[in-house]
Structures are given as C-alpha cells and as structure tokens.
C-alpha cells in the first residue's frame, strides 16, 4: 500500500556507506560505478553470476511499464564501527546512521527530486553498506537488511523542503562466498517501497509456518542463485502494482484454457469468490528460465488472495500469530498438499507429483472451482476450469499412509491420520476421505 509511482521512470535515491572498520571490497572496485551499473545498466551481467540489473528486473516484471532510475551517491564513511549501528537487534542504531548519511550528502543532493508522489516525503533512501550482513551469516554485530522509518527511533530529518523518513538497506557481500551480492535483496526491499508486503511469516521465530518459499521474491526467492536471480514478481504483485489485468474466469462455465509463461506473455487468469470482492484466485504459468530459472519447480501456480487491508498495513499477510484475517492472505495452493520447504518442487501443477487436477475452496470453506486435465506441453499450460468434477477419478478403500496430514489448502493439521474428524484431507500426496 503506497502512493509511490509504479509506472514510468521515477528517480530513486541510493547511497553507499562505509564504516570505520569496514570498507567496500576490492571485488567492486570503483563502488559508485559498480552499483550504478548493478542497478541501472540494461542487459547487465558480471563475473559473480548476476542475471541482470534492478532496471532489467523491473522492466521484465512490469512488462516495460516501470523502468526506474537509481541515482547512486557515495561512498560516505559514518562515525562508528558497524557493530555500533547493528547493536543487539541487527538494526538498533541504523536510524542514527541514516541521519549521519543525510548530513554527509546534503550538499550534493537535492532531496526534493526524490519525492515522486508529492506527499512531502522522500519516497525512500536505499543504503548499500560495505561488508556482509547478518541475514545470511547469522553473525551478531552485523546489520540485518531491512526496511524501516527513522521517525520510529525519534528522528525528524528534513532537507530541501521534504522529510527523509523511510529507508531500506542491504549488504555488499554474500555472507557465505564473500563476493558481491546480486539484486535479490534490493528488489525485495524496494518492493516494500512500491507497496507490496513480505510473504514470509515475519514472526517466524515464534512459528514454524511455511508460506511460499522460493517461489516469490517477497519471500525466500530473493535468495535464489545467491541473490543473483530473484524470480520475477508474480501475477498477484503485478496486479497490485497495476502491471497486469488478469482475464476473469467464470467458474460456473466449464472451459478449456491455455496459458503461456508469465515471463513471456504477462497473462494470468483470475477466479473471483462470489460476494467477496477482496478474495480471489490467480492462475499463472511459471517456467524455469530467465529470472525464473532458479524456481523450485515449474507449471501452474495457483494463488489464493485475501486483500485484507489491516494485514497489509501491518505487514502480516502470512503471519500465523498476528494476522488480522486469521489465515494466510497471499498464499500458493500446494498441488501436492504439502506446505514444507522440502516439498517446494511439488507446489505447482502438475509438478513433480504429476497432479493434474484440484478443487479450490474459499476461506469460508465453500468450493469455488475445480481444475482438471492440467498438462504442460513444453512451456505451454493447458487445463479445464469449472465447477463440475471433484477431480477424484476413482475411490479405493485403504488405510491412510503414515506421515503428516494436510487440509486441502495445504495447511498441516495433524502428524497422522488417526482420530481425524470427518472430511477430505491430503496424506502422502493423495486425497483421503475420513467418514
């Protein structure tokens, strides 16, 4: 939820920051030139495995509608060692760091040009800080890449008639390899600037919930291929940002459809939930090529969306504990019924389990539509959608397999099939009926 422009070529502010004890490495050479190219150069590549620049990513994700210009300043050196700004939380004094950075670049920057929506505030100041970060090292004393507001720490910064409040930051180096990172974390954090939320459980330290994993850049996908190849924004993100107008399907009519890869055609289907304008399903075709090369699988991804404003505003759309909706608001319907990190390759249809049908329920537990005959011919998906067959082609009477049991929306509900109430579940990758 944001008023920042998501079309055209708006300017964005980026600053390179060094600490008393950490400077940019020899890998990046001239840091300003390196980051100017990493963010802006068309058809970019480098020796560290980059699949493109941030410009390339946004141009591809938006089908050419959004081509931002990133102005890079610095490097500037702040007054303390990195551990001081990181503190015990990984971001304890980063607001102070932002305050110092603004003072250091004030003479060469007209901050007013970075208020692209005219609300009196700089849209965002993005900081690349020298060295490694805490997220991919687990090392205390390093800053955790994040998105925040300095006003939450008591700072009021105003220059050139505009307020500098919101910022985001990420590290220079890969925590494992020690080489420069690609644009994965950058396009994730900048996604927040555009108005899209995290899709992981932001309270994951208190839960064990799996959401959409490597399938999405706003979840763990930002780390795909060492952050060099984040997956393109999904049909849901494109829809939210005004980059796609999905084709609406009426589930009361049985129809055969085909779908080319989202990366090639920028096309998706939307299945509405009756009497619920904020709830719907999105169908997209994802194939492992280009920016999507490092997805965990390929085929049809079915998104179940609930545009719950409170959950979006709190950045809690998929939280297990604090989500105002009481359920995941932006989730993938797992084809194999297993919502785990180890089974991500089975999330798509037909997927590794060759699951060619599915029945999809609203959050009120009402059947909305069925899909059958889901198949892939090269990159092309074909399927039949309607409200007819349940997709259960035959019934056999057997005991359920040992192992966890999932609801039809992919939520793990039991360690085994014993003592379950009546209903239809997923166990061992198959539907089971408890009577």
Question: Model segments located where?
Answer:
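A short beta-strand micro-motif
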Residues: 15, 271-273, 404-406
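Short, ordered coil/turn segments that flank beta-strands lining enzyme active or ligand-binding pockets
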Residues: 118, 189, 276, 408-410, ...
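Residue-level detector of short, conserved catalytic/binding motifs and their immediate flanks
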Residues: 10-15, 123-125, 182-183, 216, ...
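Non-catalytic C-terminal accessory/binding modules of secreted extracellular proteins
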Residues: 25-37, 41-65, 69-72, 137-176, ...
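C-terminal accessory segments of proteins
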Residues: 190, 237, 242-243, 261
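Low-complexity, Pro/Thr/Ser/Gly/Ala-rich linker/spacer regions in secreted
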Residues: 1-5, 384-399
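C-terminal outer-membrane/trafficking sorting elements
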Residues: 390-435
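Active-site-proximal segment of zinc-dependent metalloprotease catalytic domains
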Residues: 1-211, 215-226, 237, 312, ...
């Amino acid at each position: 939820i944001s008023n920042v422009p998501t079309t055209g070529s708006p300017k964005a502010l980026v600053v390179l920051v060094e600490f008393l004890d950490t400077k940019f490495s020899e890998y990046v050479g001239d840091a300003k030139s390196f980051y100017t190219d990493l963010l802006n150069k068309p058809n970019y590549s480098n020796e560290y495995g980059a699949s493109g620049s941030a410009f390339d990513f946004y141009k591809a994700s938006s089908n050419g509608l959004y081509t931002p210009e990133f102005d890079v300043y610095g490097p500037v050196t702040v007054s303390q060692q990195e551990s001081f700004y990181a503190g015990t939380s990984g971001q304890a004094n980063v607001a102070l760091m932002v305050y110092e950075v603004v003072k250091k670049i004030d003479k060469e920057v007209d901050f007013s040009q970075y208020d692209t929506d005219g609300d009196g505030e700089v849209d965002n100041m993005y900081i690349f800080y020298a060295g490694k970060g805490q997220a991919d090292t687990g090392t205390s004393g390093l800053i955790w890449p994040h998105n925040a507001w300095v006003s939450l720490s008591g700072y009021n910064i105003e220059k050139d008639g505009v307020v500098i409040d919101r910022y985001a930051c990420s590290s220079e180096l890969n925590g494992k390899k020690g080489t420069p990172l690609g644009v994965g974390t950058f396009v994730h954090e900048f996604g927040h600037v555009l108005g899209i939320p995290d899709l992981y459980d932001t309270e994951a330290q208190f839960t064990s919930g799996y959401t959409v994993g490597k399938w999405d850049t706003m979840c763990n996908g930002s780390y795909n291929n060492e952050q060099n190849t984040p997956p393109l924004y999904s049909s849901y993100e494109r829809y939210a940002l005004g980059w796609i107008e999905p084709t609406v399907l009426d589930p009361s009519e049985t129809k055969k459809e085909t779908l080319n890869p989202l990366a090639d055609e920028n096309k998706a289907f939307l299945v509405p939930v009756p009497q619920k304008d904020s709830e719907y399903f999105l169908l997209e075709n994802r194939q492992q090529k280009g920016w999507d090369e490092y997805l965990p699988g390929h085929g049809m991804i079915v998104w179940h969306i609930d545009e719950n404003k409170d959950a979006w505003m709190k950045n809690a759309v998929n939280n297990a504990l604090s989500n105002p909706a009481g359920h995941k608001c932006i989730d993938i319907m797992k084809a194999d019924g297993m919502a785990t990190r180890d089974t991500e390759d089975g999330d798509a249809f037909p997927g590794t389990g060759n699951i060619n049908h599915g029945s999809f329920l609203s959050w009120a537990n009402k059947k909305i539509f069925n899909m059958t005959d889901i198949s892939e011919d090269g990159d092309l998906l074909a399927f039949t959608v309607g409200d007819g067959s349940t997709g259960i082609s035959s019934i056999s009477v057997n005991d359920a397999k040992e192992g966890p049991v999932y609801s039809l929306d992919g939520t793990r509900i039991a360690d085994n099939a014993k003592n379950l109430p009546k209903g239809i579940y997923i166990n061992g990758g198959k539907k089971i009926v408890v009577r």
